């Protein structure tokens, strides 16, 4: 099960964030998201 606002695909949870970020800021942002989130 994925958190509210997230989508499931092949057993993984994904969510699109539209705010532009550089790589370092995006990585920090992802670490604040639910467990097992990945920077894509």
Curated annotation (Swiss-Prot):
Gene3D superfamilies: Mannose-Binding Protein A, subunit A (3.10.100.10). It is found in: Secreted. It comes from the Eukaryota. Disulfide bonds join 2-13. InterPro entries: C-type_lectin-like/link_sf, CTDL_fold. Expressed by the venom gland. Its main location: secreted. One of its GO terms (molecular function) is toxin activity. GO terms for cellular component: extracellular region. Keywords: Disulfide bond, Hemostasis impairing toxin, Secreted, Toxin. Signal peptide: none annotated. Belongs to the snaclec family. Interferes with one step of hemostasis (modulation of platelet aggregation, or coagulation cascade, for example). Dimer (non-covalently linked) of heterodimers of subunits alpha and beta (disulfide-linked). This is Snaclec LmrLEC-1. It comes from Lachesis muta rhombeata.
